[in-house]
C-alpha cells in the first residue's frame, strides 16, 4: 500500500464510519479492489482513531459533562450511598455507567476471538452475508419500531443490548453504528437517540482497539505486509478525522428528518454487487488475509 492509497482508504473510512453501512466492510472491499488484498486489521483499527477523534470534538460538551458527573458521583460528591455513586440522581453519570456496561461485551469478545476477527471473519463472503442480513433487519426494525425513548430513559438492560449490538460489529459487514442503531431502534429509541448512543458508546471500544493495534504495529512493523508505514497511516488518520467531522454534522441532520431505509437499501445492493464480483473472480474472499492457522 502506498501513501495515496492509504489516504484514499482514510477517506473511505471517514465517509462510512458513522453511517450504518459498515466502514470495515468498505475498507476491506475497496482495499481488495485497489490493492488486491485486505488492508489489514491493524491499519483499519488505527485509522478509526481519526474518526473517533472527530466524535470527541463534536460531542466534547456531552463527553465532558458525562466524565465530570461520573467522577463526582463515584467520589461521593452527589451522596455517599451506593445509589448516588452509581448516578441515581444524575443522568449524565448514569449514562457514563451505561457506556461502560455497553463496552464490556465488545471487550470480552474482542479478547476471546481476536484471532478469528483478524483472519476468518474477514472473509468477504461473511462480509456480504452481514451486509445483506443486517440491511434487511435495519429496514424492518426502523420501519416498525416505536419512537418513544431518549437517552434519559436508558437502563442497565438497554445498555447491555446496545453493547451486544456493538459487539456484533466485530464482524465486518455488520457496522458498529448499524448494530447499535438497530438494537436501539428495536428497543424503541428515537432515531436521534440511537445515533447518539452509537457515537458515544463506540469511543472506548474504538480507541482501545486502535491503541492496541498501534502498539502491535510498533512492536513488529514488518508483520503486516499491507501496512503502509506510519507516515501514510497517520496522514490517512488525519483525513479520516477532518472528513469524519463533516459527515457527523450531515448524518445527524439527515436522521432528524429521514428514516434509515436508504442505508438499508444501499447495504443490500452493495452485498449483491460484491457477491457478483466474488462469483466472477474480480474479488477474492481471502486475498491478503493471514492464514487462520498461524495463531
Swiss-Prot record:
Subcellular location as annotated: Cell membrane
Transmembrane parts of this sequence: 39-59, 97-117, 121-141, 198-218, 232-252, 263-283
Main location: membrane
Protein's membrane topology: Multi-pass membrane protein
Keyword Metal-binding (UniProt): no
Pfam families, A to Z: BacA
Enzyme Commission number, as recorded: 3.6.1.27
Keyword Nucleotide-binding in annotation: no
GO annotation terms (biological process): cell wall organization; peptidoglycan biosynthetic process; regulation of cell shape; response to antibiotic
Known function: Catalyzes the dephosphorylation of undecaprenyl diphosphate (UPP). Confers resistance to bacitracin.
Other noteworthy facts: Bacitracin is thought to be involved in the inhibition of peptidoglycan synthesis by sequestering undecaprenyl diphosphate, thereby reducing the pool of lipid carrier available.
NCBIfam families cross-referenced by the UniProt entry: PRK00281.2-1, undec_PP_bacA
Family: Belongs to the UppP family.
Designated name of the protein: Undecaprenyl-diphosphatase
Native source species: Bifidobacterium animalis subsp. lactis (strain AD011)
Amino acid at each position: 500500500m502506498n501513501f495515496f492509497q492509504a489516504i484514499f482508504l482514510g477517506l473511505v473510512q471517514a465517509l462510512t464510519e458513522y453511517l450504518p453501512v459498515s466502514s470495515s466492510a468498505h475498507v476491506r472491499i475497496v482495499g481488495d479492489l485497489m490493492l488486491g488484498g485486505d488492508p489489514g486489521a491493524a491499519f483499519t483499527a488505527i485509522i478509526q482513531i481519526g474518526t473517533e477523534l472527530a466524535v470527541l470534538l463534536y460531542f466534547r460538551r456531552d463527553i465532558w459533562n458525562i466524565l465530570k458527573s461520573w467522577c463526582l458521583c463515584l467520589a461521593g460528591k452527589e451522596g455517599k450511598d451506593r445509589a448516588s455513586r452509581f448516578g441515581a440522581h444524575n443522568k449524565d453519570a448514569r449514562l457514563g455507567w451505561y457506556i461502560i456496561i455497553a463496552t464490556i461485551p465488545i471487550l470480552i469478545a474482542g479478547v476471546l476471538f481476536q484471532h478469528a476477527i483478524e483472519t476468518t471473519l474477514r472473509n468477504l463472503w461473511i462480509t456480504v452475508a452481514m451486509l445483506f442480513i443486517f440491511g434487511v433487519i435495519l429496514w424492518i426494525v426502523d420501519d416498525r419500531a416505536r419512537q418513544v425513548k431518549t437517552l434519559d430513559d436508558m437502563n442497565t438492560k438497554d445498555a447491555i443490548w446496545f453493547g451486544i449490538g456493538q459487539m456484533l460489529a466485530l464482524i465486518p459487514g455488520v457496522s458498529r453504528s448499524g448494530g447499535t442503531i438497530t438494537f436501539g431502534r428495536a428497543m424503541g429509541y428515537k432515531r436521534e437517540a440511537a445515533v447518539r448512543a452509537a457515537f458515544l458508546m463506540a469511543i472506548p471500544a474504538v480507541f482501545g482497539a486502535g491503541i492496541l493495534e498501534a502498539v502491535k504495529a510498533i512492536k513488529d512493523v514488518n508483520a503486516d505486509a499491507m501496512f503502509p508505514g506510519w507516515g501514510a497511516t497517520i496522514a490517512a488518520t488525519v483525513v479520516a478525522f477532518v472528513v469524519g467531522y463533516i459527515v457527523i454534522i450531515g448524518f445527524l441532520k439527515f436522521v432528524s428528518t429521514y428514516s434509515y431505509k436508504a442505508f438499508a437499501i444501499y447495504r443490500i445492493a452493495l452485498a449483491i454487487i460484491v457477491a457478483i464480483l466474488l462469483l466472477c473472480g474480480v474479488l477474492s474472499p481471502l486475498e491478503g488475509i493471514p492464514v487462520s492457522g498461524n495463531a
